Curated annotation (Swiss-Prot):
Keywords attached to this entry: Ribonucleoprotein, Ribosomal protein, RNA-binding, rRNA-binding
Subunit structure: Part of the 50S ribosomal subunit. Forms a bridge to the 30S subunit in the 70S ribosome.
The family this protein is said to belong to: Belongs to the universal ribosomal protein uL2 family.
Renumbered residue ranges of the record's region Disordered: 28-56, 221-278
Pfam families from the UniProt entry: Ribosomal_L2, Ribosomal_L2_C
A Gene Ontology molecular function term of the record: structural constituent of ribosome
Biased composition (Basic residues): 269-278
Annotated function: One of the primary rRNA binding proteins. Required for association of the 30S and 50S subunits to form the 70S ribosome, for tRNA binding and peptide bond formation. It has been suggested to have peptidyltransferase activity; this is somewhat controversial. Makes several contacts with the 16S rRNA in the 70S ribosome.
SUPFAM superfamilies referenced in this protein's UniProt entry, alphabetically: Nucleic acid-binding proteins (SSF50249), Translation proteins SH3-like domain (SSF50104)
Record protein name field: Large ribosomal subunit protein uL2
Amino acid sequence: MALKHYNPTSPARRGLILVDKSGLHKGKPVKALTEGKRKSGGRNNQGHATARGIAGGHKQKYRIVDFKRRKWDQPATVERLEYDPNRSAFIALVKYEDGELAYILAPQRLAAGDVVLAAKKTDTKPGNAMEIGQAPVGTIVHNVEMKPGKGGQIARAAGTYVQIVGRDKGMVMVRLNSGEQRYIRSDCMCTVGAVSNPDNANQNLAKAGRNRWLGRRPLTRGVAKNPVDHPHGGGEGRTSGGRHPVTPWGKPTKGARTRHNKATDKFIIRSRHAKKKR
């Protein structure tokens, strides 16, 4: 779907660029496939604020999306594409031959009336799901499992995808959007195609209120605060902070590595940080 550029008929419209959603379903979601969703406001179970910048936003219903795609060898027809407030990608309502309805992540170039299939091995057609070991080398896939049966975890955001680059000893080598190359078990499921709504990143919301509708609060820079409130605070006039970027609690941020998982390090062939090391 294309981007929609608005005319500056008011200050709030100047520079406004949004994704054109005219091709999406305009009604409500399927009630049986929705759940209630309570906003946390960035608070944990003790009421303490653990995530800053989260508050308010429009009330949302959670859509139950099938990330597992384990209903094998049963064709499903795409009824319609829908907006989902819980994710950046669009979702597709599919109807199986036995009448069951389900939501799946909508890949690019999927339209109402298309037939999708999940099987151990199937055609490389957008929306079809199969074991990643059965897909040809070079295939673009998304919604990739990391453990068989757990459901897709990699490449679920708008416009993302994974490319299969090779096979080795029952494992499949894939390249992620970040540049990382890693092994994935060949019996993990994946869905063919790239995720829909690739223009999501090119939107310009044009006004603060539109961010508030999405539940995002303003973020105050550390250098604009007092020394009592942030390690970057204080100084006479405008200062640059004087140290590597840190959080208000002094922990490194903006590119500092936080991954500590020796058990799965062996599956990473090439780190996403490899370019930085040179």
